[in-house]
């Protein structure tokens, strides 16, 4: 367990607080009444507390990201669509609910930027097999929903880097790109 400390909303909130993003997340985690204090108060323990700003985590993410690129699972393209900053999520027009983010209901804004994408479409058959032929997804009633809503219409490749802000793990082979926060946290 640990904390997910990168992304546009962290960068924005740190700027609003007159702090660097690192100082901002340090205060949230280590400061008085921060995450670590709250865990002690609630008697929560863990084997290892991982912060996504830890050097070893950043190095591991960069290594995995580069390997995925070298294997052809990541390619450079351009993202154009709607973006919800609080959710740190990209959306297509058809996914919006009354023109707003389907997750949080907040306003979205137009976004266009160079980005790297993960070839999720390459793995559609494997994902479908995993869903339909194993007990991977629980409850099982969700299998049809996933297959019909995501697999059959065609899995879209996923945006895995950002260029419109800098608070994140740098893509070491392409300056100006940072690893998208949700990918960064997945490798935790």
Report the location of each language-model feature.
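Short, surface-exposed recognition loops or helix-turn segments adjacent to catalytic cores
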Residues: 78-83, 144
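N-terminal Rossmann-like or analogous alpha/beta NTP/dinucleotide-binding catalytic cores
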Residues: 1-74, 88, 129
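Short linker/helix segments within small regulatory modules
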Residues: 92-97, 173
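Structured secondary-structure scaffolds
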Residues: 1, 56-60, 86, 104, ...
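The −1 position to Zn-ligating cysteines in a subset of zinc-ribbon hairpins
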Residues: 67, 83, 90, 100, ...
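Cys/His-rich microdomains that often coordinate metals
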Residues: 91, 107-108
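A short alpha-helix-loop-beta-strand transition element characteristic
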Residues: 73-78, 108-109
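Short metal-coordination and nucleic-acid-contact micro-motifs, chiefly zinc-binding Cys/His arrays
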Residues: 80, 97-98
